A protein has these predicted regions:
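N-terminal subdomain of nucleotide-sugar transferases
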Residues: 2-73, 414-418
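Short alpha-helical donor nucleotide-sugar binding micro-motif in glycosyltransferases
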Residues: 164-165, 289-290, 297-302
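Carbohydrate-associated surface elements
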Residues: 177, 197
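Conserved donor-binding/catalytic core segment of Leloir-type glycosyltransferases
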Residues: 217, 221-247
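Nucleotide-activated donor-binding/catalytic signature segment of Leloir-type glycosyltransferases, i.e.
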Residues: 272-290
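Short hydrophobic beta-strand element within catalytic cores of glycosyltransferases
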Residues: 327-330
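Conserved acidic donor-binding segment of nucleotide-sugar-dependent glycosyltransferases
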Residues: 342-353, 361-366
Length: 418
């Protein structure tokens, strides 16, 4: 099992200095959705281009219309589950797919298991290109909840994984936690750990005071140095309701504490109703969906980043928050390994008492807050986009080199048709 961990530097070779690969990234989530997968793909796209790669992206359109926007190819899709915001596409003969196959990528990197993955695999087969897949989601937790540990569920997930990842020559996971997912059990020898990366320059310039004050006014909160921020998709598995339930206890310790929730999703109505019913509406504000390029401004409104999710694999929001100098206060979870050191760049909590103690302790000590801020900024440096892209490109080259060594590829046809 290979690992491209954040503590290791990729070995530089003479070949790797001149990267000129043609890479196709395939994803369901891109531009039209604000979530972790979108952030990963955008970061990887930018990083690979900075290394000299030609990059194109295949993604689902937010409507039934297919179109091309620069190097991004969007195929028409249908909304099949509004609650979970799932879209699928059946446009397997879309001319855009033929155009991508004719472009002949050197490698196809798939960031989804949905219908886009099926399209991308067909493109790879036509182009004679190897496939790398990244798994971003704990499917067992997402779909089966408390039944995920049962033998039938594990068997079903192993079968699903055997079919889904069969064509992938390597499977990228963003954290150690992912290795134990049942759907990856059939291909343990193909797993590579590459931690996600972010564009640090997008997050580190602080907001000018006038812009900061304007943002606070726009959401109806005070710029009082007591603001908690959570950037998340509003769905049940993110467990934001737990923080809302803890908030009255926090207000007894820190009466002027307030929470800014950045993001949208199917659970928003329930969360807002809880705030109204419990008298929290003046202390908790929901922004709705914010464009990815604007999210950094909202991180900078906060003094602490909070999360109750146990669904994360390698959360982009944890990295982005630290790049903005925010200490983290997160529910205990294996995904925090290597990201959050308890007492150094934030606090880990297990119950309501620990949550209140962690938040009030940081807000009550300027020295502690500044120490954790410095540690957060330092930790974020380990997850920069440059290192992320270098490690990923090193994997691409090793996959292509292994394939070349095994056998000479068949001559490619002059025309490609689906």
């Amino acid at each position: 099992m290979l690992e491209y961990a954040h503590s290791a530097q990729p070995q530089q070779s003479e070949e790797a200095v001149i990267p000129a690969m043609k890479i196709l990234l395939a994803t369901d989530c891109y531009r039209f959705q604000t979530n972790g997968i979108t952030s990963v793909v955008l970061s990887l796209e930018d990083g690979l281009r900075n290394l000299g790669c030609e990059v194109r992206v295949l993604a689902l359109s937010s409507s039934r219309k297919s179109f091309r926007d620069g190097e991004a190819f969007f195929v028409g899709s249908h909304l099949v589950n509004q609650k979970q915001e799932h879209r699928v596409s059946f446009a397997f003969r879309d001319p855009l797919l033929e155009e991508l196959a004719a472009w002949r990528p050197d490698l196809v990197h798939i960031h989804t298991e949905g219908t886009i993955a099926m399209m991308a695999k067909r493109i790879a087969k036509k182009a004679g290109a190897p496939v790398v897949m990244t798994t971003h989601t704990d499917f067992e937790y997402f779909y089966f909840g408390r039944f995920r540990a049962s033998a039938p569920v594990k068997a079903l997930c192993r079968l699903y994984g055997r079919i889904t990842y069969r064509q992938a020559e390597k499977i990228v996971v963003p954290a150690e936690k992912s290795k134990s997912f049942p759907h990856l059990a059939p291909y343990q020898d193909r797993i590579v750990v590459i931690h996600n990366g972010i564009r640090l320059d997008r997050f580190q310039p602080p907001l000018p005071p006038s812009a900061r004050s304007g943002l606070f006014a726009s959401v109806g909160l005070e710029d009082n140095g007591r603001t908690l921020v959570s950037v998340t998709r509003l769905s049940r598995e993110k467990n934001l309701i737990e923080i809302l339930r803890f908030f009255p206890s926090l207000l007894r310790e820190v009466p002027d504490a307030q929470l800014l929730v950045v993001g949208d999703g199917a659970d928003r109505d329930r969360l807002e109703a809880f705030c109204r019913e419990n008298g929290l509406s003046t202390r908790v504000r929901f922004t709705g969906m914010i464009p990815p390029e604007e999210v950094c401004r909202y991180y900078h409104m906060g003094d602490i980043y909070v999360s109750a999710s146990m669904f994360e694999v390698n959360s982009m929001s944890y990295l982005e928050a630290q790049a903005c100098g925010l200490p983290l206060v997160c529910r205990e979870d294996e995904s925090l390994r290597g990201v959050l050191d308890d007492g150094v760049n934030g606090r880990i909590y297990r119950n309501e008492r620990e949550f209140v103690s962690a938040v009030s302790g940081i807000l009550g000590s300027e020295a502690l807050r500044q120490s954790m801020r410095a540690a957060a900024l330092d930790r974020a440096e380990d997850f920069g986009i440059g290192r992320f892209a270098e490690r990923t490109l090193a994997l691409y080259r090793s996959v292509c080199a292994a394939r070349t060594g095994e056998a000479s590829p068949a001559p490619k046809e002059k025309s490609v048709h689906f």
